[in-house]
């Protein structure tokens, strides 16, 4: 019977779990919303013994991968998956980037090391851009007064709706090992996303600010230090994946529709 174990049942992995359970899979997992504690070696190893597939969404700890460090010897499964980041490509100056590009040149060197370690184990590595969806979108930032429009002309980012992410991982269950970018079709500036969300809400967008005026944290400033467009052609060709939400406009409309009484 198809049985998946997920390390790290967070926002994205919970959607994957739900989609697989709806398809008849048995899914176990660790994490704050999982059945098992990551440090419970005996229970985790028993669960890994029951699983036919293993997926990790656990981020690096320093330069190390916590899952591989602690349970790598138990990962002899034919199907391994890892949720990585398109940040491994670094800054491309707004140019398109696909899976043939070198990884490790950006600020996320630890993620690139973990990405490579999972690829070395013949895993399916899903490189993800900014993830958004219900409960985690521009609407929440606007409601919390945290939405910012930063004056950085020509800067763009890629993103993916969490439901399309889950569908991409499901499509990857029958795919050969390798890296797969799961991004929608329309890279766009963060400003464009905020402006569209405000338009849908009938609100005036926040004022345009410089990075200095916005008072962003160092982590947030790092987000704006990179500029790239993530290509999804390989996922379309090899996985047969097609995003249900091909751009942020479609995704935001659906989120708002679902949240309306």
Language-model segments: residues:
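Conserved Rossmann-fold NAD(P)-dependent oxidoreductase catalytic core, especially the SDR/UDP-sugar
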Residues: 70-106
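Substrate-positioning beta->alpha
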Residues: 133-141, 150-171, 178
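Conserved C-terminal active-site "lid" loop/helix of NAD(P)H-dependent oxidoreductases
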Residues: 195, 214-242
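Amphipathic terminal alpha-helices
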Residues: 246-261
